[in-house]
Amino acid sequence: MRKLRETIHIYHTNDLHSHLENWPSIHHFLSERRKKHASDSSLILDIGDHVDRSNIYTEGTLGRGNVKLLNDAQYDYATIGNNEGITLSHEELDSLYEQAKFEVIVSNFTDLEGNIPRWVKPYKIHQTASGIRIGIIAATADYSVYYEKLGWRLQDPLPRLQA
């Protein structure tokens, strides 16, 4: 059996809550890291609560401006937090990621009929150029009562992550 050896850089953001005054610094940092480690593999993830409607840009674009920022920074994957999930209507959330150039991973999220939305993947096996496989999993916090009022269903995150 051949041994694979590779350096993998994993960067993530979380809980930005649309504090976009920090975004130029974050974007610059991630861009510089990708350049610095161009010969290695790297992943950039947002692990939820990027969107917060308290920001006028986010409110005015219904979060689509946030998705554009993630696209521009070349994110690979994202998941949703409660700010994406329960502050946007069903229709707004269902269309939020239409222009995303990254994949949205959420293992415990469906519509009320149990269907996984077209923009969601419950998990992803990411393969690097040298063949190393990395499992990408994510779940959002179980605020079931609020999600169900908006036409979504959440499962208990722990069993979904263990599945």
Describe the function of each predicted region.
Residues M1-A163:
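Acidic, metal/ion-coordinating pockets
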